[in-house]
């Protein structure tokens, strides 16, 4: 949620930002109009309350009963006006609040302006794409042949976009999760969390998933519970409605969770394999920091995610996302791993800085110094990394001519020393 003062003091800045992300700049005028009506109503209520207070004192001083009754009746009318105006102010406040919840964040000046994902900018490519002397297979062929991916049974029990992982495939995923979390905790200084997979609507509002993305989230019927689309939601809401001490910052958390997304997928797009699913696992990094340090913390976050890519020795690239692909971030970078069997780059991490946009919605603040007025923290999050796309990259980059898959060296201690699948 944006600070209302931006609309009052820098409306042109907000209009420009909305235009860049494809939202109607006219929304700024709606906000300003509602804010003005609300403030006028509040001012009038305060004036009437002062009038009522003065009138009440006057009534107390009036000894003539008839005159006192007239003044009491007049004060009752004032009270009725106050009640009516209070209701109007509350209705306007709710309308304004709901409008602000639906508005996007503002992109930083350095974010490239674009119309869609094709306008994202490749910052750099790391690693060398290998060209083996045999026909590279896609992961779905490898996985089925190795007996570690079962698509038929997954679809039979749950429908399209579901699969069953078996045997060493599961062990590979567990190894990845443990290795990634150990890296983030031991090397990068994160605190590991185990969080609920179901959260209330308020938590979804806090991270910006509601109301805008309601149709992409699974809701438990007849309850106020929603399945999390990412650990970002429960982890960010850990400090909802709290005032932190400056000494507690920065807070760096990491969590592994399943993620559930009711994405509307185009028929025929990415039908095969495990690239696009309604349920998948992910390791997520979340930070809550002082505003002055948030930009530096973003590149530290990206570096933390890159360390996973480097450890696996899989070619990857870093992209800066354009204004059309930011979501609710103010600046965002993606990491994509090369998948030779699919002949494409796969997003495995999206690292974003949100400024105080989420903190304002979730009311997460900190006190810069003892006795000082609380201020909103800045939040950041990024995948560290997303599964099962990392598994796709491992299967397709580490496959051998005989159909087996070499286990990346860093994962072998987590797999009991197993060096090869198949």
Curated annotation (Swiss-Prot):
Its main location: cytoplasm. Signal peptide: none annotated. L-serine binds at residues 230-232, 284, 383. GO terms for cellular component: cytoplasm. It catalyses: tRNA(Ser) + L-serine + ATP = L-seryl-tRNA(Ser) + AMP + diphosphate + H(+); tRNA(Sec) + L-serine + ATP = L-seryl-tRNA(Sec) + AMP + diphosphate + H(+). GO terms for biological process: selenocysteine biosynthetic process; seryl-tRNA aminoacylation. GO terms for molecular function: ATP binding; serine-tRNA ligase activity. It is found in: Cytoplasm. InterPro entries: aa-tRNA-synt_IIb (IPR002314), aa-tRNA-synth_II (IPR006195), aa-tRNA-synth_II/BPL/LPL (IPR045864), Ser-tRNA-ligase_type_1 (IPR002317), Ser-tRNA-synth_1_N (IPR015866), SerRS_1_N_sf (IPR042103), SerRS_core (IPR033729), tRNA-bd_arm (IPR010978). NCBIfam families: serS. Belongs to the class-II aminoacyl-tRNA synthetase family. Type-1 seryl-tRNA synthetase subfamily. Homodimer. The tRNA molecule binds across the dimer. This is Serine--tRNA ligase. It comes from Herpetosiphon aurantiacus (strain ATCC 23779 / DSM 785 / 114-95). The lineage of its organism: Bacteria, Bacillati, Chloroflexota, Chloroflexia, Herpetosiphonales.
């Amino acid at each position: 949620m944006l600070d209302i003062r931006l609309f009052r003091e820098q409306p042109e800045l907000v209009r420009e930002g909305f235009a860049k992300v494809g939202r109607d700049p006219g929304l700024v005028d709606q906000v300003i109009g509602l804010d003005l009506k609300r403030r006028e109503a509040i001012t009038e209520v305060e004036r009437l309350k002062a009038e009522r207070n003065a009138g009440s004192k006057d009534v107390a001083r009036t000894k003539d009963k008839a005159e006192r009754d007239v003044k009491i009746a007049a004060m009752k009318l004032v009270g009725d006006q106050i009640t009516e105006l209070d209701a109007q102010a509350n209705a306007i406040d709710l309308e304004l609040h709901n409008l602000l919840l639906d508005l996007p964040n503002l992109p930083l000046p350095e974010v490239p302006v674009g119309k869609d994902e094709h306008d994202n900018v490749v910052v750099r490519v790391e690693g060398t794409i290998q060209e083996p002397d045999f026909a590279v297979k896609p992961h779905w062929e490898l996985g089925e042949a190795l007996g570690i991916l079962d698509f038929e049974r997954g679809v039979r029990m749950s429908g399209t976009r579901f699969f069953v992982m078996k045997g060493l495939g599961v062990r590979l995923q567990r190894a990845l999760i443990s290795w990634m979390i150990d890296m983030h905790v031991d090397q990068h200084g994160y605190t590991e969390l185990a969080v609920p997979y179901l959260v209330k609507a308020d938590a979804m509002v806090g991270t910006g998933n509601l109301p805008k993305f309601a149709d992409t989230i699974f809701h438990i019927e007849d309850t106020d519970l929603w399945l999390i689309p990412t650990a970002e939601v429960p982890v960010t809401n850990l400090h909802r409605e709290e005032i932190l001490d400056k000494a507690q910052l920065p807070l760096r958390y990491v969590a592994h969770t399943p993620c559930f997304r009711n994405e509307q997928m185009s028929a025929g797009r990415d039908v095969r394999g495990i690239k696009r699913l309604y349920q998948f696992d992910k390791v997520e990094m979340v930070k809550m920091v002082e505003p002055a340090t948030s930009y530096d913390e973003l590149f530290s976050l990206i570096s933390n995610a890159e360390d996973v890519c480097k450890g696996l020795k899989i070619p990857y690239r870093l992209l800066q996302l354009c204004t059309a692909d930011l979501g609710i971030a103010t600046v965002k970078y993606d990491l994509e791993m090369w998948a030779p069997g699919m002949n494409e780059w796969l997003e495995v991490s999206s690292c974003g800085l949100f400024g105080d946009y989420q903190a304002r919605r979730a009311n997460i603040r900190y006190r810069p110094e003892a006795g000082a007025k609380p201020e909103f923290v800045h939040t950041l999050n990024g995948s560290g990394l997303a599964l099962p796309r990392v598994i796709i990259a491992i299967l397709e980059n580490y496959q051998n001519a005989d159909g087996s898959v070499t286990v990346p060296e860093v994962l072998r201690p987590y797999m009991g020393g197993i060096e090869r699948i198949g």
